[in-house]
């Protein structure tokens, strides 16, 4: 660090004009290996370090001689030397030195306003760094937290440590001043006592400004004589402006050093213990080495190591400098944390209330479950970009994506930028069933080269949720999965298709049993035309690759154990139709053509619902009929009986349709059970036979295992109740 002009003159005056004191001279002030123009190094506040051959009795003389020799007037020209007699030894306290100095000054009657004030000003210049040099960064990293916090916060302040390069130049036997070294407050108090003793002619001595005696609290570096003198937090005299600025710097640096320098020892667990966890030790060591800034303490989550709130920051790197950095220009003005810079925002986790900073970050493009959620293009257009990027890139991208999205039907509504329907689309399925029929088959035209490439869609942007091609493919996959499969209808089944099998919308479609084609001949039927079953005939036959409708075999259920086949095409086309209407109380169709629409499961479900309703009504009607009294001979009794008859007759007529529906469905189900009884009987017989065959196979496998054991052991093991050929040789013997 370069010395200022006053400090250079002070060093020259020390080396040339200091009177010798015993064996001490100015040349011996400098440690070995240092040039005369280098600054002196202090071990304690205000105390210089010198070589071992320096006289211990001249310690205070050195300190005070620098004060007087730093002034423009040489001490040798005075009629009376400022200090007479032998100097005190090193064991004498600093307060006694100052008191003796005050008594000698009182004897000499030196005018304080003319002599001491310039000397103290130069002394403050030498020992205390100026305001302009307070922000130097060379010595800032080597300061102790006690230098920043001041003596008022640490009453027992020991000698300040020197930087490593300074300690190497200090002789091992060099004496040092006491830990209670000269502070600005002690200097001010002793000088004020001297003023009271000296009389009113020295009234100007008390007007020494506090910035010249107290250390600015923002001082970080030392020029010339050593570390700065730390004063109390309260100024001696008026100087509130400089002190207020110093307080702001003090709180700032105190927060910095509170994190940078830990107060405890590093963690050292017992590695020979059974409870020692190396991962836990590593985490504790990381927490100790890189502490977090003091802030609201959040509960530690044992399962997740990700912070849920961006409240705690690291020990701070960019916070030291007050200059404008590239990271500070990208800071969002609406961030919750004042330290949350733009470089830290993308690395923050996403959870619950954890998006406090990310919600305000204009580049937040996230992938939701229901569709692609994109932030508004107005925010994206106002995002600060590095110099050299084109402002029209976002507008070109918006126009390109909007144009291509309108051409593509399946994803045009979900990817329209800036549309207010984006938020509602996130909670709905990507393709509602009401819109599936209106979607055109030529939707895969989205894969044409009309889509802009990744290079065209802003390759300069860094935080995109998904690439364009991946989003495009996912949209096509969802479209192809929701696309219904169109089939050709059987002859005469165009009207039957509208009221096909239906189950609840939340459940899969019910399986359809084509019992007429499985067991019965194609010519048998109950009531309808030839070749048609009135209740169980398929109304939709899927087409094979040759364009011919494939019918199920008559022996599918009877001779094989194949699973019951369903119609996947009818699931997407007919859900919420027949069964919900039947359960709601509507009358079943009575013609043969309408009866052929229902499947077996639907018929069973409808029959059970209607039968339960009919049974409940019959119980109620029976109770009313039993409680009704016989008609009386009076006119009033006859009127009441007639009214009761009308109500009863009306109730019976209303439930006549329910009774007929139950009877009709019951007859159909009974006939179906009778027709399927041989099939069911055959299936049960085969199951029983298969069970016996499985048991015999298990016994045979067990016998083979025993035979293998016999061959390995060299002996014959005879199973129970199973005579073998090995018994005959034993019988002959």
UniProtKB/Swiss-Prot annotation:
Extent of Polar residues compositional bias: 231-241, 540-569
Stretches for region Disordered: 71-92, 150-207, 222-244, 420-442, 497-571
Job of this protein: Involved in maintenance of centrosome cohesion, probably as part of a linker structure which prevents centrosome splitting. Required for localization of CDK5RAP2 to the centrosome during interphase. Contributes to CROCC/rootletin filament formation.
Subunit-structure text: Interacts with CNTLN; the interaction recruits CEP68 to the centrosome. Interacts with the SCF(FBXW11) complex which contains SKP1, CUL1 and FBXW11; the interaction is probably mediated by FBXW11 and the complex also contains CDK5RAP2 and PCNT. Also interacts with F-box protein BTRC. Interacts with serine/threonine-protein kinase PLK1; the interaction leads to phosphorylation of CEP68 and its subsequent degradation. Interacts with NEK2; the interaction leads to phosphorylation of CEP68.
GO molecular function: protein domain specific binding; protein kinase binding
Superkingdom of this protein's organism: Eukaryota
Entry PTM: Phosphorylation by PLK1 is required for binding to BTRC in prometaphase. Phosphorylated directly or indirectly by NEK2. NEK2-mediated phosphorylation promotes CEP68 dissociation from the centrosome and its degradation at the onset of mitosis.
Name of this protein: Centrosomal protein of 68 kDa
Ranges in a coiled coil: none
Record field: compositional bias (Low complexity): 178-190
């Amino acid at each position: 660090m370069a010395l200022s002009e006053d400090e250079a003159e002070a060093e020259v005056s020390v080396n040339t004009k200091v009177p010798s004191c015993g064996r001490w001279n100015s040349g011996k002030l400098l440690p070995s290996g240092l040039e005369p123009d280098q600054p002196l190094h202090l071990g304690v506040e205000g105390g210089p370090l010198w070589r071992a051959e320096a006289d211990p009795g001249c310690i205070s003389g050195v300190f005070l001689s620098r004060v007087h020799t730093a002034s423009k007037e040489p001490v040798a020209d005075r009629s009376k030397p400022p200090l007479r007699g032998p100097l005190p030894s090193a064991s004498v306290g600093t307060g006694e030195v100052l008191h003796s100095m005050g008594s000698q000054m009182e004897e000499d009657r030196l005018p304080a306003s003319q002599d001491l004030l310039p000397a103290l000003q130069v002394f403050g210049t030498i020992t205390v760094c100026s305001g302009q040099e307070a922000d130097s960064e060379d010595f800032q990293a080597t300061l102790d937290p006690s230098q920043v916090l001041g003596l008022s916060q640490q009453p027992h302040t020991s000698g300040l440590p020197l930087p490593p390069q300074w300690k190497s130049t200090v002789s091992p036997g060099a004496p040092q001043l006491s830990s209670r070294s000269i502070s600005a407050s002690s200097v001010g108090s002793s000088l004020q006592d001297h003023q009271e003793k000296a009389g009113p002619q020295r009234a100007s001595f008390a007007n020494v400004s506090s910035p010249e005696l107290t250390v600015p609290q923002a001082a970080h570096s030392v020029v010339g004589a050593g570390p700065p003198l730390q004063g109390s937090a309260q100024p001696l005299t008026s100087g509130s402006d400089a002190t207020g600025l110093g307080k702001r710097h003090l709180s700032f640096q105190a927060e910095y050093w509170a994190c940078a320098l830990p107060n405890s020892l590093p963690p050292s667990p017992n590695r020979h213990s059974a409870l020692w966890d190396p991962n836990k030790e590593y985490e504790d060591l990381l927490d100790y080495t890189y502490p977090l800034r003091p802030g609201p303490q959040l509960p530690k989550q044992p399962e997740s190591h990700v912070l849920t709130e961006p409240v705690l920051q690291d020990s701070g790197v960019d916070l030291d400098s007050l200059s404008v950095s590239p990271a500070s220009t990208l800071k969002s003005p609406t961030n919750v944390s004042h330290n949350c810079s733009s470089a830290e925002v993308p690395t923050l986790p996403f959870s619950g209330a954890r998006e406090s900073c990310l919600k305000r970050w204009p580049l937040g493009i996230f992938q939701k479950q229901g569709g692609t959620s994109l932030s508004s293009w107005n925010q994206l257009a106002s995002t600060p970009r590095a110099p050299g990027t084109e402002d029209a890139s976002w507008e070109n991208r918006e126009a390109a994506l909007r144009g291509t999205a309108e051409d593509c039907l399946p994803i045009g509504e979900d990817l329209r930028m800036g549309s207010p329907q984006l938020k509602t689309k996130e909670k709905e399925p990507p393709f509602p069933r009401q819109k599936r029929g209106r979607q055109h088959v030529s939707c895969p035209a989205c894969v044409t080269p009309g889509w802009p490439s990744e290079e065209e869609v802003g390759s300069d942007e860094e935080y995109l949720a998904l690439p364009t091609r991946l989003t495009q493919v996912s949209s096509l996959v969802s479209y192809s999965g929701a696309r219904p499969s169109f089939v050709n209808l059987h002859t005469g089944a165009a009207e039957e298709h509208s009221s096909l099998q239906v189950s609840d919308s939340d459940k899969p479609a019910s399986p359809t049993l084509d019992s007429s084609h499985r067991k019965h001949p194609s010519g048998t039927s109950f009531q309808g035309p030839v070749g048609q079953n009135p209740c169980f005939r398929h109304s939709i036959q899927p087409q094979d690759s040759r364009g011919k409708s494939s019918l199920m075999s008559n022996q599918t259920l009877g001779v094989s154990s194949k699973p019951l086949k369903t119609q996947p095409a009818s699931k997407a086309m007919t859900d919420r139709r027949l069964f919900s209407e039947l359960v709601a109380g509507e009358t079943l169709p009575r013609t043969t053509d309408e009866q052929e629409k229902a499947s077996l499961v639907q018929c069973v479900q409808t029959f059970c619902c209607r039968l339960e309703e009919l049974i409940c009504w019959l119980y109620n009607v029976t109770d009313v009929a039993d409680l009704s009294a016989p008609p009386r001979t009076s006119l009033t009794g006859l009127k009441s009986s007639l009214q009761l008859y009308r109500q009863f007759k009306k109730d019976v007529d209303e439930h006549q349709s329910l009774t007929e529906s139950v009877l009709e469905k019951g007859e159909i189900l009974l006939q179906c059970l009778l027709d399927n009884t041989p099939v069911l009987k055959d299936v049960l017989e085969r199951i029983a036979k298969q069970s016996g065959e499985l048991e015999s196979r298990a016994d045979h496998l067990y016998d083979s295992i025993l035979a293998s054991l016999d061959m390995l052991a060299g002996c014959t093991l005879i199973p129970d109740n199973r005579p073998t050929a090995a018994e005959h040789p034993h019988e002959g013997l």
